[in-house]
Amino acid sequence: MSARRPFSKWALLALLFVTLVAIDQWTKYLAVERLTTLFERTGAETLGERLAGFLEHQHLEPISTDPYYVWRPVWRMNYVENPGAAWGLFRGHSEAFRNGFFTLVSLGAVAFILHYYRKLRAEQRYLQVALALVLSGAVGNFLDRLARGYVIDFIEWYWWNRPDIRWPTFNIADSLIVVGVALLVLHPGSGKAAQKAGADAEGDRRASTGG
């Protein structure tokens, strides 16, 4: 009996990439559904109509009620359209500049990640997963910018019962990038290449994602 072939690193990347990007986009759809007036205003009822509205409509009106609290002392959901980066960076620049800049940064980060991933050995699963997380997050936010010119953010963390002291609103794609970068930096055998990947990806998160 022939030995069982190990799961290809490219198959692992494809599986994680498709799954994580789908989760990111689905949670953004849920944010639009639960936190904006889009479907009420357009009368969309079926899933197909709502998905079409999610992809086609821009600059949506948030619901007028209080934000949805996951855990009231520290965590709530709040719909935000972020045309810039974290802490409002690049908001003052023109849309054409932002789109061009974020496109170049995102494509550069994706190219670097794939170049580094190609060099990994089949048994380096830890680094494969870390890079897959960063890649999925970068592409998830890039799809937002490509379709709308801004990133949909909705997760809002703040200091204990102090919503005025809060972290910039973010999304699942941002979380994937942060976790992936942390794994790269903390990996004891990652070496200088992984350190460089972490620094490059963190720069992409700040410059080309929503927070």
UniProtKB/Swiss-Prot annotation:
GO terms for molecular function: aspartic-type endopeptidase activity. Keywords: Aspartyl protease, Cell inner membrane, Cell membrane, Hydrolase, Membrane, Protease, Transmembrane, Transmembrane helix. Its EC number is 3.4.23.36. It is found in: Cell inner membrane. Signal peptide: none annotated. Pathway: Protein modification; lipoprotein biosynthesis (signal peptide cleavage). It is a multi-pass membrane protein. Its main location: membrane. It catalyses: Release of signal peptides from bacterial membrane prolipoproteins. Hydrolyzes -Xaa-Yaa-Zaa-|-(S,diacylglyceryl)Cys-, in which Xaa is hydrophobic (preferably Leu), and Yaa (Ala or Ser) and Zaa (Gly or Ala) have small, neutral side chains. One of its GO terms (biological process) is proteolysis. PROSITE patterns: SPASE_II. It is an enzyme of class 3 (hydrolase). The chain crosses the membrane at residues 12-32, 96-116, 127-147, 167-187. GO terms for cellular component: plasma membrane. The active site is at 153, 174. InterPro entries: Peptidase_A8. Belongs to the peptidase A8 family. This protein specifically catalyzes the removal of signal peptides from prolipoproteins. PANTHER family: LIPOPROTEIN SIGNAL PEPTIDASE. This is Lipoprotein signal peptidase. It comes from Anaeromyxobacter sp. (strain Fw109-5). The gene is lspA.
